[in-house]
A protein has these predicted regions:
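Short loop/turn segments that flank or connect secondary-structure elements
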Residues: 1-193
Length: 193
């Protein structure tokens, strides 16, 4: 692990390869698992504000869940997460004509309808952020549904941190990411990665 400011980064983030292959996985990370995506407290209001913009895109089951419990809930581990439908799909998940799932929030962002991209934890996946007092931990999360992304990352030689440059900058800032790149060069120079 290396430390940049108050952020500790696992070496896996530099060593492992990853490049989403949506055509292969069809967005499984949005529909698999036992809880919704982690949400930061300040994102709840943004989720609620974008709701009227994306409401008609959402499945009837998702709208029913949102009407009953809201856009987020506290999971078994005590974390705030996006609401889910039938213990599976994120409520913001939609499907295209090919059966590929996509995020209704991200689609609205790309269509210029909102400034909110999507929860940062979704944007950062397969990185997960842990809070440890004054420190944050950046870890690479391995999941079987992302096997195609690992293969594509190896083929294209794209490390996790490179694939996630934009969301890492969103979370920690441009200066932090530049320091991360300097650290990578140092680690490579000393054959540590």
């Amino acid at each position: 692990m290396i430390q940049i400011g108050d952020v500790v980064v696992s070496l896996d983030v530099f060593q492992e390869k990853f490049l989403c292959d949506l055509g292969a996985c069809k967005g499984a990370c949005c529909i698999e698992g036992d809880a919704g995506a982690p949400v930061e407290l300040d994102e709840v209001m943004e989720l609620e504000e974008v709701l009227p913009i994306i409401w008609d895109e959402l499945a009837p089951e998702a709208r029913a869940v949102i009407e009953e419990q809201g856009v987020v809930y506290t999971d078994e581990e005590g974390d705030l997460v996006t609401s889910i439908v039938n213990n599976k799909d994120c409520v913001f998940t939609c499907y295209d004509e090919k059966g590929c799932c996509y995020c209704a929030i991200e689609k609205a962002y790309r269509d210029g309808k909102t400034d909110f991209y999507k929860p940062v934890s979704c944007h950062l996946y397969p990185i997960r952020i842990g809070d440890y007092g004054p420190y944050k931990a950046v870890n690479y999360h391995r999941w079987d549904v992302c096997k195609a992304a690992v293969l594509l990352g190896k083929k294209e030689n794209v490390a996790v941190y490179q694939f996630l440059k934009e969301p890492l900058i969103r979370k920690f800032g441009e200066k932090w990411y530049q320091e991360l790149e300097v650290a990578v060069k140092e680690l490579k120079a000393h054959d540590m990665i």
